[in-house]
C-alpha cells in the first residue's frame, strides 16, 4: 500500500496502473492499459524479496471469498439512479441491506457503490460499463456465505426494476 498510487483490477485479471511507481530508485511509468502480467510479476518479486514461496504468501492472506452476478436487461440509467438514491443515506442502505449484513462501517462511490459492513462483509453495486446490466459483487469470510449473500442481494435488486 502506498500513498497516492492508483491502481485498478478487473475480475478477468486485467490490471491498470494510473500512477508512476518508484521503488529502490527505479521508476515504472503509469500503465494506462489493461495488463495481466504486472500482478504476476508483483507476486513473484514479493515472494523473492521475502524468501518464501507463493504458497507462503497466500497463507499469509486473510481468508476472503467473493461471489458476483448481474441482473441482465437492467437499463444503465436506472442503475445509476437507484445506486445514487441509495448512496444518499446510510439509513437507506441499512434498511435495504442491514438485514443481510448489519451496520454499515463505510461506503465508497468511486465505482458504483461499495458498502462495507461492521461484520466485514462487502456489497458492491455498479452498472455494467458495456451492457444494460446491474452488477453485484460480494465479499465474505466463506465461499458459501459470499454466494448466499450475492443471491440475497440480487433478490433485493430485482425489486428495483
Place the predicted regions along the sequence by residue.
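Phosphate-binding and adjacent anionic-ligand microenvironments
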Residues: 1-129, 133-135, 140-161
